[in-house]
Amino acid sequence: MSTSDSIVSSQTKQSSWRKSDTTWTLGLFGTAIGAGVLFFPIRAGFGGLIPILLMLVLAYPIAFYCHRALARLCLSGSNPSGNITETVEEHFGKTGGVVITFLYFFAICPLLWIYGVTITNTFMTFWENQLGFAPLNRGFVALFLLLLMAFVIWFGKDLMVKVMSYLVWPFIASLVLISLSLIPYWNSAVIDQVDLGSLSLTGHDGILITVWLGISIMVFSFNFSPIVSSFVVSKREEYEKDFGRDFTERKCSQIISRASMLMVAVVMFFAFSCLFTLSPANMAEAKAQNIPVLSYLANHFASMTGTKTTFAITLEYAASIIALVAIFKSFFGHYLGTLEGLNGLILKFGYKGDKTKVSLGKLNTISMIFIMGSTWVVAYANPNILDLIEAMGAPIIASLLCLLPMYAIRKAPSLAKYRGRLDNVFVTVIGLLTILNIVYKLF
C-alpha cells in the first residue's frame, strides 16, 4: 500500500462514526426527554386520531430541521471554541449578545414556572388519590416543595448534577416500559370516534387548529436547544482542524438526525400508547385537571372497578412516582440555566459587567429569591399548564430555535450558502406558527 493510500485509509477511519458521536446522540436525546413529554400526549390526543397522525408526520422534520438550523448558526463563528453568544456577537455586535442572553433567560424561566405548577399538581394528586389523604392547602404545598428543592440546590449542587445525569436513562426506560405495559389496556375508542363525514378542518376544534396548537407542544417537548451550543463546540474541537468545517457540519447534522429519530420514536410511541389506553375525552379531562398524563393514568387505574391486578396497582403508583421524579429532574436542570442567565443579566445591568463588585454567593442568593418567589406565585395561581406552554414557553423557544438561525442565514455572510433552501421555509413557518399561538390565546 502506498503512502497516500495509508493517509486516506487513516483519515477515513478517523472520520467514521466514533464513540463520542454516539455519546452526543444519546446526550441530545436525553436532554429533550423530560417533563415536557408528559404533556405531549394530552395535547396530541386531544383532537383524536387524525390530528395525532398528522403530528407523527411532522414530528421528525420539526425536531431535525429546527435543531440543525441552530447548530449551523453555532458553527458559523470564526472561533471553534466560541459558544452561541460569541457567535451572535460576531455577526450582530454587542446588541446581538444582549438579545441572545435575554432570549436564553426568557426561554428557560417560564419553563421553571410551568414545572412549579406541574410538581404542585402532581404531588397533590398523588397525595389525595393514591395515598388517600385529605387535601392540603395549595400555597403550603407549593412553598414546601420549592423550599425543599432550594435546600437541595443550595447545599448539594454537585450531587444534584450527578443525580440528574443518572436519572435520564431510568426515566427514558420507564417511559418505554410504561408504553409497553399499557398495550394490554389498549382499546378502540379513539378509532371508533373517527367520523369522516363530520370532520372539520377549521373552527375551534378543527383538525388544522388542533395540529397548529400541537406544533407548539412539539417544539416544547422535542427541544434540546439548551445543549446545542456545547455540542457544536465539542464537535468543532474534535473534527474541524483535521477534516474541515463542512465535514463537521455534516457530522453534526448526522448526530442531530439520529437523536431526533430516537426522540420521536420514544415520545410518539408513548403518546399513541396513552391515547389507545384512554380516549380523547380523557385527554380533555386531563387538560382540565391540569395534571401530566402519568398522573391521569394513575388516577385512571385507581378508579378501575372490580378486582385490580397486581400489575394495575403497581402501574398506578409507579406512574405518579415517575412523573414526580421527571419533574424534579427537569426543574433542577432548568434552574441551573435560569440561575446562570439571571446572574449574567444582573451582572451586566446592575454592576455594569464588573465581577469584582459583587460576590457569586450574593448573585446566587438574589437570583434564587427571584426565581423561587416568582415560581411560587405562578404555582399558587395554578394557570393551565398547556395554555402556559403554548402562550409562553413554546413561542420563546421557537424564536431562539427557529427564527434566530433563519435571520442569521439571511444576514450573515458566513451562512450565505444555506440561503434559498426549502427547509429554511419550513423552519420559518414552524417558528411563526408557534409564536402566533400568543395571538390565538388572546382571542
Curated annotation (Swiss-Prot):
Catalytic reaction equation(s): L-threonine(in) + H(+)(in) = L-threonine(out) + H(+)(out); L-serine(in) + H(+)(in) = L-serine(out) + H(+)(out)
Name of protein: Threonine/serine transporter TdcC
Protein family per UniProt: Belongs to the amino acid/polyamine transporter 2 family. SdaC/TdcC subfamily.
Signal sequence range: none
Organism: Escherichia coli O1:K1 / APEC
TM region(s), chain numbering: 22-42, 44-64, 97-117, 140-160, 163-183, 207-227, 261-281, 311-331, 366-386, 389-409, 423-443
Keywords: Amino-acid transport, Cell inner membrane, Cell membrane, Membrane, Symport, Transmembrane, Transmembrane helix, Transport
Membrane topology type: Multi-pass membrane protein
One Gene Ontology term, aspect cellular component: plasma membrane
Main location: membrane
Any Pfam family the entry gives: Trp_Tyr_perm
Compartments reported by the entry: Cell inner membrane
GO MF terms, alphabetically ordered: L-serine transmembrane transporter activity; symporter activity; threonine efflux transmembrane transporter activity
Functional note: Involved in the import of threonine and serine into the cell, with the concomitant import of a proton (symport system).
